[in-house]
Regions:
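Bacterial N-terminal signal peptides that target proteins for export
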Residues: 1-9
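A general structural signal for short secondary-structure junctions and capping/turn motifs
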Residues: 3, 75, 168-170
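Hydrophobic h-region of N-terminal signal peptides that target proteins for export
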Residues: 9-22
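Surface-exposed, glycine-biased beta-strand/turn segments
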Residues: 20-122, 164, 201-347
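Short beta-strand-turn/beta-hairpin segments enriched in glycine/proline and small hydrophobics
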Residues: 83-85, 124-139
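Solvent-exposed coil/turn segments that connect beta secondary-structure elements
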Residues: 88-90, 105, 113, 129-131, ...
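Conserved, short, structured surface segments that act as functional micro-motifs
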Residues: 117-127, 141, 151-226
Length: 348
């Protein structure tokens, strides 16, 4: 027992003492660092309350799309899980020429060269080993994919070329959609087959299994503080809600992948209080003595705006009261691996 505990804390200390990863933007577009967001992000076409516009904000991370009025307040109702980086060079026909490169060292773990198999179009996923944790970057809407699964890459290694493959894009709005995130489960295929009728062509590297963090925010914070670690950035994100879940016989596999998320708690715990950002990614696991038989919302940042607009539909309710929606329950089950094992998980 003592060896196990010391082993756990040894891994945690080692992770927190690890050197910060070397990172760089994935294309020649560096306007994020020049305080020129309108040149960095690809705009979205918007019509709202009779006015049309092309706001660059729609290409940034977070709740930045589909404005609505809720109780007289302007609310962005759609969550964008990555950032859309505009091209800096096009050919005479208007096709983007920008090369798309890995943001950091790692290994190519997935390529999807058939555009019709995902809303991402043609995309690549790179696995990074940061602080003894696996973190994933995703590069979507490519015109061509040159990387191959198993390739070792460095920051700046070419993965493909920018394009406009995928849902709802055209040549004018060509861009690379970039995500940086955490893997929710190593059994995603079973979860997908249990919850959906559609084919999963991407195994554990389906975009639904990668919980995106504010990647532009990470780049900007690292610009100010080159010693900032990814774990420190994630742990600093505002908490929107917490869900208390029954503790199983073993620690959640998610926590074994990201041990730096474990907070101090009570000994002999019977549950975990899992903290979530408004964007739906996990921030913390805290041991708790609260007895619950099923996941229950145990903490909430109050708001007079219905929680579904603030949590991408993971919660229902408003004010100081909320509960998990059907989508929220599915997300929690994915994080906890609490779903049936489907023997014939889809690999089509």
């Amino acid at each position: 027992m003592i060896r196990n505990v010391l082993g756990y804390w040894g891994v945690l200390v080692c992770a927190l003492c690890a050197e910060p990863a070397v990172i760089s933007l994935p294309t020649a577009n560096q306007h994020l660092f020049g305080d020129e967001p309108e040149k960095f992000y690809m705009y979205v076409n918007r019509t709202f309350e009779g006015e049309t516009s092309k706001p660059w904000e729609g290409g940034s991370f977070g709740y930045v799309r589909s404005p609505i009025r809720v109780g007289g307040k302007l609310v962005m109702s759609r969550f964008h899980e990555g950032i859309d980086i505009a091209p800096v060079k096009r050919d005479k026909a208007g096709n983007p020429l920008d090369l798309v490169m890995s943001i950091s060292g790692g290994r190519v773990v997935h390529t999807s060269p058939i555009s019709g198999r995902s809303n991402y179009g043609k995309y690549v996923v790179v696995e990074h080993d940061w602080e003894n944790s696996k973190v994933y970057s995703l590069y979507a809407h490519l015109s061509t994919v040159t990387a191959k699964v198993g390739d070792a890459v460095n920051a700046g290694s070419v993965l493909g070329r920018m394009g406009y493959t995928g849902a709802g894009l055209n040549r004018t709005r060509a861009h690379v959609h970039l995500e940086l995130g955490l893997q929710m489960s190593t059994r995603y295929g079973s979860w997908h087959d249990h919850n959906f009728g559609s084919a999963n062509y991407h195994g554990n590297f389906n975009g639904m299994n990668i919980a995106g963090v504010d990647i532009a925010g990470f780049f900007l914070e690292r610009r100010k503080n080159p010693e900032l670690k990814f774990s420190e950035f994630v742990l600093s994100r505002p908490m929107q809600f917490k869900v208390t879940v029954p503790a199983g016989a073993a620690e959640p596999e998610f926590l074994s992948r990201y041990p730096w998320m474990r907070r101090k708690g009570v000994p002999d715990h019977v549950s975990w209080e899992v903290g979530f950002a408004a964007t739906g990614h996990v921030i913390s696991f805290t041991p708790s003595k609260r007895k619950v038989s099923a996941p229950v919302v145990s903490h909430l940042r109050p708001s007079d705006i219905p929680q579904r607009w603030l949590t991408r539909g993971l919660l229902t309710g408003e004010g100081n009261s909320a509960s998990l929606s059907a989508g929220g329950k599915k997300l929690v089950s994915l994080v906890l691996d609490s779903f049936p094992i489907v023997e014939a998980a889809s690999t089509r």
